[in-house]
From Swiss-Prot:
It comes from Escherichia coli (strain K12). This is Probable cyclic di-GMP phosphodiesterase PdeD. Disruption phenotype: Cells lacking this gene show increased aggregation, increased cellulose production but no increase in surface attachment. It catalyses: 3',3'-c-di-GMP + H2O = 5'-phosphoguanylyl(3'->5')guanosine + H(+). The lineage of its organism: Bacteria, Pseudomonadati, Pseudomonadota, Gammaproteobacteria, Enterobacterales. Phosphodiesterase (PDE) that catalyzes the hydrolysis of cyclic-di-GMP (c-di-GMP) to 5'-pGpG. May serve as a negative regulator of cellulose synthesis (as has been suggested for S.typhimurium); overexpression inhibits cell aggregation in strains able to produce adhesive curli fimbriae. Cyclic-di-GMP is a second messenger which controls cell surface-associated traits in bacteria. One of its GO terms (cellular component) is plasma membrane. GO terms for molecular function: cyclic-guanylate-specific phosphodiesterase activity.
Length: 532
């Protein structure tokens, strides 16, 4: 008792440490996640803003570029002829302020004014040019002083002729570059070396506020750049973080409390299981399997019982699920393999005698089961036929079917235990190709009743016969059930009608024909327990 109390005291101290660590990690993780997500959100908004502005301006300029190709053939025609097509094109392109035709360096026809005789160099010093240009400048003719964006398209084979389109860029930027606080303090359009700053018109250089960050996106189609200025995603995230502290503290306290509740029993019990394995507190029991026709014992199912000196007999219904949850089911299975081999002398020395051992699907992962069988079973060269009964507590999807094929190659039979009650699927029968289906005792108990399970029992039997799979009925307790199962072609029967689970050392006496003795352990009669 003293040792158990010491274990509990140590566990409680460790439990407090674990819960405190969980709470602190939750606090730090929550704040970190909120900081990172807010920073990413800030950055995403800046990027989306700039990309949206670039995309929209591209959409404006692309039709102008296509339209200028249509207007190039008008160069050289009299303005009286070209004026109407210019006006129609300007009307179609709603963002255009005016379109002009240039020949010999002179703007001679405008969509607004008609005939003109203005040197184009007076409008923009870089015109005419032999290559396409995009420039920001000031309108000196129509709306004097307002910014415009000029797109120049030269005529083929000429450096003094082309189409000049003036775009109402001020209106566009007013819609596209309006700052979005707090992420974006200011935005501007840069073409060549001039900048159109929202709310400030054309400037030759952009202001650089202290502690602000600048983000730029350039168009892949046209020579312009969108500049976005703001306090920066990281700085804003730090500024926003204190508002998340109350929620993070509450969440960390909640996680700490949940961890305290979750570890109250399960962690201590996992320690008990490890201790039980180390001190060999687990004992192997077996339940005979009888041939349905001859009534002769043809095998056993190995069962595990735990006589805990600190808490008394513990049912498999208690320790098996907890062992699975804490990843201790594989060590328990290894223990069963080792003890079965050590006591194999209690079984008939016949290759026709079956020894069934339960394994979890998780044991199939990464070839662990093959390694364990090589170490504990095959190395001893037992004569008896090994049957691995795959339990359905875990999803059978965990089974590595390559391992299943390797087991068949090694002459190990596979059985699906408690078929129809867990995670199995009929489609897996074809993939796994089991040799045996074990009908769960709940279906056996329904025999002779009107319960739905009675119909399911018939379906399982028919399925096994159709697939040529050997059938074992568990939980046979009455002669009526046994007769029904024999009549319907079930090959092997198992249940209290024939024998209760017994320690392995008592099996030879039972097999010799004596009455099944009371199950004992260390001189004490054990309670009757369920098979699982």
């Amino acid at each position: 008792m003293q040792k158990a109390q010491r274990i509990i005291k140590t566990y409680r101290r460790n439990r407090m440490i674990v819960c405190t660590i969980c709470a602190l990690v939750t606090l730090a993780s929550t704040l970190s996640v909120r900081f990172i997500s807010q920073r990413n959100l800030n950055q995403q908004r800046v990027v989306q803003f700039a990309n949206h502005a670039v995309e929209e301006l591209d959409k404006v300029l692309l039709p102008l570029q296509a339209g200028s190709e249509v207007l190039l053939p008008l160069i050289g025609l009299p303005c009286s002829v070209a004026h109407l097509p210019l006006r129609k094109q300007a009307a179609k392109l709603q963002t255009v302020r005016s379109i002009g035709l240039v020949q010999d360096g002179t703007l001679y026809c405008s969509s607004i004014f008609g005939y003109r005789n203005v040197p184009v160099v007076d409008i923009l010093a870089e015109l005419p040019a032999p290559q396409p240009l995009l420039r920001l400048t000031i309108d000196r003719a129509l709306i004097k002083g307002s910014p415009v964006l000029i797109q120049w398209t030269p005529a083929a084979g000429s450096s003094n002729a082309g189409v000049m389109e003036m775009i109402n860029i001020d209106l566009l930027t007013a819609m596209l570059l309006e700052p979005q606080l707090p992420q974006i303090s200011s935005a501007s359009l840069t073409v060549d070396k001039r900048h159109l700053l929202y709310g400030n018109g054309l400037v030759d250089s952009l202001p650089q506020p202290e502690d602000n960050e600048n983000y730029q996106v350039s168009s892949q189609r046209f020579p312009f750049t969108i500049n976005v200025n703001g306090p920066g995603a990281t700085a804003l995230a730090w500024h926003y973080l204190p508002t998340q502290l109350p929620l993070a503290v509450l969440l960390s306290l909640l996680v700490g409390y949940i961890a305290w509740l979750a570890t109250a029993y399960r962690m201590s019990f996992s320690r008990e299981i490890n201790l039980g394995l180390a001190q060999h507190e687990f004992e192997l029991f077996c339940q005979p399997l009888l041939n349905a026709r001859s009534q002769q014992c043809i095998g056993v199912e190995i069962l595990l019982r735990w006589n805990n000196p600190r808490q008394g007999w513990i049912s498999p219904d208690v320790f098996i699920p907890i062992a699975e949850e804490h990843h201790l089911i594989v060590p328990l299975t290894r223990y069963v393999m080792a003890e079965t081999i050590r006591q194999r002398h209690v079984f008939p020395m016949s290759s026709q005698f079956h020894v069934g051992i339960n394994v979890a699907p998780s044991h199939f992962r990464r070839g662990v089961l093959i390694k364990d069988l090589n170490q504990y079973w095959f190395s001893a060269h037992p004569i008896q036929q090994l049957i691995l009964e795959i339990t359905e507590r875990d999803a059978l999807l965990d089974v590595d079917y390559r391992i299943a094929r390797e087991l068949h190659r090694k002459n190990v039979k596979l059985a699906i235990d408690d078929f129809g009650t867990g995670n199995s699927s009929f489609s897996w029968l074809e993939t796994l190709r089991p040799d045996v289906l074990k009908i769960d005792k709940s279906f056996t108990a329904a025999i002779g009743s009107d319960a739905v399970n009675s119909t399911v029992t018939d379906i399982i039997i028919a399925l096994g016969q159709r697939l040529n799979i050997e059938l074992v009925a568990e939980g046979v307790e009455t002669q009526e059930q046994a007769k029904y199962l024999r009549r319907h072609g079930v090959h092997i029967l198992q249940g209290y009608l024939y024998a209760q689970p017994m320690p392995l050392r008592d099996f030879p006496k039972w097999l010799a024909g004596s009455q099944p003795p009371p199950a004992r352990h260390n001189g004490h009669i054990t309670p009757i327990m369920p098979l699982r």
